[in-house]
Amino acid sequence: MVTAAGSPSSSSARKPASRPRLPCRDILVHIEAYLSRRDGVDNLLKVSLYAARLALALAAGQPPLPHAATARLRSFESSVGLSRKAFRLGKFVQSINALRAAAYHPHPHVHPLLVLLAYGGQGVYNFLEQFAWLAKAGLLPARLLPRRLHRIGVWAQLLAHVGSIAIKLEEVAELECGVEARLEEGCGEESEVVRTLSRKLLLKLMSLVQDMVDSAMTVGDVTGRKGLLGSSTLMASAGLLSALISVHKNWNSC
C-alpha cells in the first residue's frame, strides 16, 4: 500500500532489505589464483609429503606393501621434501619483513620478545634450510652441513612456535572480546560485523591448532622421536592435519 504522498507505508518501510548475494567465483579462476601463490604450491607439496609418509607408516603393518611400491613412495617423499625446501627462501624474507613491520608498528598487547621469538626463530630456521637444500641438491658437499646446524634450526623453529602460539592466544582473546562487545551493543549474531569477527576468530583458532600440531612435531625432532612422538603414523597424521589447515586458510584468503 502507498500513502497519499506516494511513499511506502510504514509496514513496508520496516521490512528488512535482503542481503545482496555475492556472485559465485569461477572455480578455475580460484584455483589459478591459489596456485600462483608461493604458499599455495607449498601447501599442496606439504599435503603430498605427509600423505606419502602416512601411507609408508601404514604400509609397515600387515600386510605390507610390495617392495617396489614402498620404494616409489620413499622416492616421492624425498623429492617432495627437497622441493619444499626451495620455498624457504621466500619464507625467510617474509620473516624479515614481519620483524620490520613489527618494529615500526608494534602490537599494543603483544610483548616484543614474543614477536622476536616467532619471526626471528622462523627466520633462522628458514635461513639454515637453504644450506640443507643446497647440500641435498648436490651443490654443496654434505660434510658442510653438520648435524649441529640441523639441531640449531630445529630449536629455532621450536622457539618460533612458542612465540607464535603465545601471540595467537592473545589475538584469539581479543577477537572473542570483540564478538562479545558487539553482541552486548545489540548486534545480532547474523549481523555483518559479528559474522566477520566470527570468521576471523575461526581462522585464528585453526592457526592456533596448526601451531600446536607443528610444535609437537618439532618437539619430536628435538627429542629424537621418543615415546608417543616416535609413532610414525601419529606424526604423519599430525603433519597432514597441519597441511590441510594451511590449504583451507590460503584457499579462503585468495
Curated annotation (Swiss-Prot):
Please list which residues make up the signal peptide.
none
What's the main place this protein lives? membrane
Q: Which UniProt keywords apply?
A: Membrane, Peroxisome, Peroxisome biogenesis, Transmembrane, Transmembrane helix
InterPro entries attached to this UniProt entry = PEX11 (IPR008733)
GO molecular-function term, one example from the UniProt record: identical protein binding
| Topology Cytoplasmic: residue spans | 1-113, 248-254
Per the UniProt topology annotation, the Lumenal ranges are: 135-227
Q: Which Pfam families match?
A: PEX11
Subcellular location per the Swiss-Prot or TrEMBL entry: Peroxisome membrane
The family classification in the record reads: Belongs to the peroxin-11 family.
Q: What does this protein do?
A: Involved in peroxisomal proliferation.
* Identification of the protein by name: Peroxisomal membrane protein 11-2
Q: Which organism is it from?
A: Oryza sativa subsp. japonica
